[in-house]
């Protein structure tokens, strides 16, 4: 697997390499209201502000539910040691932080994407809902 090095999806730079420990945050789709997203567009330090805003606990906060939080953990545990090495994580009411290292035959994008797809699909099933569960 070739790693991309520095790249961006138009909003956050990423460094895809097996040689670095990755810190990734992903959030529920409703975790930031429109006004907060507008503030982020103009912020000097958007990542600092993003974390401050997420910690306000906006949205449905489905991750506060133990069964939903366990889905996130199950996603993390699924390929630990095969595609990545999981170092640490914390599950907040409306977002997740995870610290991990990507292994040679996996990529950052595929790894995070698989966690998000698994979590969204199973959480929506558990909650009896459809639609966006996690933000892009």
Segments from the language model and where they lie:
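Short catalytic/metal-binding and nucleic-acid-binding patches
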Residues: 1-136
